[in-house]
Curated annotation (Swiss-Prot):
GN (gene name): grcA
Native species: Aliivibrio salmonicida (strain LFI1238)
Residue numbers carrying Glycine radical: G100
Keyword tags: Organic radical
Protein name: Autonomous glycyl radical cofactor
Domain of life (superkingdom): Bacteria
Gene Ontology MF: a single term: formate C-acetyltransferase activity
Nucleotide-binding is among the record's keywords: no
Length: 125
């Protein structure tokens, strides 16, 4: 479980008023903000915080430990891709992003090419 705290008293002055996310399952602390001594997003063992007093800080949105979003950006026109399906010899160097990898459009099967076109160009969100 992840909880948020603000350190109100500590032997280490760098911890004073800093805000942390504590992961009790991993015994890790992630710095959200500190005035000095620690960087934002720095992860340390919870035990490295030493002895401290703190107050709870509400986490408005539950953090995602795993998962997330993935975005492929292709700056193309639908007409260009459709023409590349019909006339691959005109576009030997046409490269697109698929699942984070750069791939030559002509190396995809026709079905994969049509799928890329359908997913890349939509009428509405």
């Amino acid at each position: 479980m992840i909880t948020g705290i603000q350190i109100t008293k500590a032997a280490n002055d760098d911890l004073l008023n800093s805000i942390w996310l504590l992961d009790s399952e991993k015994n890790e602390a992630r710095c959200v903000v500190a005035t000095s001594g620690f960087e934002a997003d720095q992860v340390i063992a919870t035990s490295a915080l030493g002895e401290y007093e703190s107050r709870d800080v509400a986490i408005e949105k539950a953090p995602k430990v795993e998962g997330g979003q993935h975005l492929n950006v292709n700056v193309l026109q639908r007409d260009t891709l459709q023409d590349a399906v019909k006339h691959p010899e005109k576009y030997p160097q046409l490269t697109i992003r698929v699942s984070g990898y750069a791939v030559r459009f002509n190396s995809l099967t026709t079905e994969q090419q049509q799928d890329v076109i359908a997913r890349t160009f939509t009428e509405t969100l």
